[in-house]
């Protein structure tokens, strides 16, 4: 009996002539994710991914947990393979699913026969194996409408496979197939979720954090490093760009009207993000903005913020309720880190009465006393780059 992981891709099915590009990217991402775990054979055939241990040291359970988080995979299941013979398939089903069959009060058999040369139809094989299983496990009965257990058989060109229920995986599209984007990673609940959601659409991420030491502590920096590390379970390796932001914020406080502090700060963030994007082949900027959540996230405020960049600004959380964002944060494992009580740069010099309905002209006038280019260049020159691996 050969134990393996059987994975089915998601939206790759919808692709046309460039389908192979997405498949190759998915296989490469899976191999990269498995490399720290052990040696595995990864094969893509007939729109399915097969993962087998290449030696005794390879941990298939650890591989299951890792691959389930790879974007581009819709479902994953443990399976076993055998020759394409009805009796071999029956024998495998009896042994491989013995515990599940013993525990179940009812079951049914479903067959997918992609190899049409197999001499039995899908229904015939299901009936044959189902009859044999019912005889071997008298504790259970056949129930084709609402069974406790579904025994799944797949007859493919290279072998036959037996498994039970497939589990939902990460879904989405393979990271890297839709280009790259700079993503703002603050340390709160929202930005890790927005980063996750854009990566799920196949985008390679370059995370950027604006650090305002000593107004924010080294613990705040460590918090963001932890969030980036947690995200790599889905995104793969990334290089975190830590931007020194203290001088910019001090200059804003010194020279600009208080009600515009946050808006001017965010305009600087956009300028710096655009510069980072240009040096990392990124075609967009990702933010965790949520319409109306805070004063800087009104339509007028966001228009002022985005006015300084030529890149598209992607806002995956823009219409979501906070509770839905929190739900995703819990699911992907970033919530507990996000709520650690370490402030980020967005809480430094917060205006008492922020402008909520600004115009671009007003904000441009408010920041006109600053040497914008010099401040941006200084910040970019001081960037600390930290590679984040799995």
Predicted region positions:
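Conserved G/P- and acidic residue-centered "switch" motifs that form tight phosphate/ATP-binding loops
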Residues: 188
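The feature marks non-catalytic terminal segments
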Residues: 340-390
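RNA-binding accessory domains that recognize and position tRNA/RNA substrates
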Residues: 1-182, 192-238, 307, 355-360, ...
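A conserved beta-strand->alpha-helix junction
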Residues: 228-255, 344
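Structural beta-sheet core signal
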Residues: 183, 207-209, 242, 287, ...
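Active-site adenylate/phosphate-handling loop in enzymes that bind or generate adenylated species
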Residues: 131-133, 166, 172-178, 245, ...
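A short alpha-helix-loop-beta-strand transition element characteristic
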Residues: 333-341
